[in-house]
Amino acid sequence: MVGAVVAAGGSIVGEGFHGRFGEAHAEVEALAAAGAAARGATLYVTLEPCCHHGKTPPCTEAVVAAGIARVVIAARDPFPAVNGGGIAALRAAGIAVEAGLCEREALRLTAPFRTLVEAKRPWVIAKWAMSLDGRMATASGESRWISSAESRAIVHRLRGRVDAIVVGIGTALADDPLLTARPDDGAATPRQLVRIVLDSHARLPPASRLVQTAREHPLLVAVGPEAPAERRQTLAAEIGRAHV
């Protein structure tokens, strides 16, 4: 969601992006790619550089140490430990800072992160296939395939970018899905999503493809207190994670 570019003399001398939580931030990656060319250059970044110690050191310190002369920020970081503090730290170090360039695009790009920080909940994407008359299945319950090959390819790419996918027990029983990310080009997915089934009565069959692949692909079954103890124990034994 966060990318950075170092530019000098009208040319890009370094690029970087934040791959995942806990890894080096976009600014640090871009500065490392630029090396000595970063001195006196301009840093463009989609989100305000952090100024606190977390999983990684403050990006503001790396920017100052690299000798960057100017920083252009698309959007402020809503995280309470930053939220304008990064801009203030850079300006205090004598670096020219501009904020708000392509802000609308940056806000859209960082919407999942902002939702987590501001609304205290995950970013949720609703996906379904529906016919022109508003139906999701035929009268007999058949639904394969309302969607097209093109839309299914998009879904698999999307699965490769999210942390989890959630379905109800009805879908799990009717479709016996895998719910894994399987890009049509065979490319490796950037992350392994957790498959979640909402199953209040612990009805997910041990022979289902979800359970049978639980050792290779993470599976979490959320069951209710009314679920029979024997079924809960069976699921827990099969997948190791049957949460009540």
Q: Model-derived features: where do they sit?
A:
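Short beta-strand scaffold segments in enzyme catalytic cores
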Residues: 2-10, 128-129
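Zn2+-dependent cytidine deaminase-like catalytic core
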Residues: 6-105, 194, 220, 225
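Proteins enriched for Cys/Gly/acidic motifs involved in redox and nucleic-acid/cofactor modification
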Residues: 22-23, 87, 101-131, 135
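Structural motif corresponding to alpha-helix initiation and N-cap regions
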Residues: 24, 56-57, 84, 103, ...
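Alpha-helical scaffold segments in soluble metabolic enzymes
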Residues: 29, 33, 62, 89, ...
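Structural signal for hydrophobic packing residues in well-ordered secondary-structure cores
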Residues: 34, 94, 117, 159-162
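Active-site ligand-binding patch in enzyme domains
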Residues: 115, 123-128, 132, 136-241
